Amino acid sequence: MTNTLWRYGRVLAVLWMAASCSLFAKAETLLWGGHPEFGIELEEEKSPDGTGLTHSITYIPALVFPNGPINRFDLLLMDEREQETTDGVVAKTNITKVALRVRKNIRFGGDWGMYVRALVGHANTPSERYNYGYTDLALRYEHDFFGFIAGVRVQRSLDGTPGHDRNKFRLGPSFDIGEHHELEFRWVRAWDAHTHAREADATILEYTYKF
């Protein structure tokens, strides 16, 4: 995991420097009034029995509309490296995904609120291609630079491809670092939507630059 994070960290540094160029700093005036953001998400997922391990990196260019009917539009570009061990034999698989996601924020007053997100995406593996989607519902607390969410995700295959229906529980803190930077940490537990067997636990680190 350390080597993986090191490689991803170098990618993050290069992209952060590129994002600082004046071309992107002026993008807000060209994007229908939305505020551009760019995120990088690193995830490690492990199966309960230790036979499965997945590392992934996701690039997330986004437009944020604080007062719009939809508050956020994300494009997710994902690259996964999946490793399965069976009887001592290790099989590795590369998975690529592309998805669109929207988010609506709902405020309760004070520091409390919630959000609803919906995603549709397409996944490509050496053995199959499938369409999938999910819906997130999360309770959110925000005070000054600190935030915390706890919520659920319902994920389903959209074309009947088996093996991709999951329910997830997600929680973790976030930290605003100055005006332009945000760090999010998430812990996720996933269950098979049909058998209710626990499938995986994941840890996620996401960095977002706000233009």
Q: Language model features by range: what are they?
A:
Residues 1-35:
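Cleavable N-terminal export/targeting peptides
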Residues 23-84, 210:
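Short glycine/proline- and aromatic-enriched beta-strand/turn motifs that initiate or cap beta-hairpins
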Residues 30-38, 65-75, 107-116, 143-150, ...:
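Repeated loop/turn-to-beta-strand initiation elements of outer-membrane beta-barrel proteins
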Residues 40-48, 77-85, 96, 104-106, ...:
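Transmembrane beta-strands of outer-membrane beta-barrel pores
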Residues 51-59, 92-98, 129-135, 163-169, ...:
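Residues that define the transmembrane beta-barrel architecture of outer-membrane proteins
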Residues 58-64, 99-104, 136-140, 172-174, ...:
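Outer-membrane beta-barrel architecture
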Residues 136-142, 147-176, 183-186:
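Conserved binding-pocket/active-site segment within a compact domain
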Residues 175, 198-211:
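Outer-membrane beta-barrel "beta-signal"
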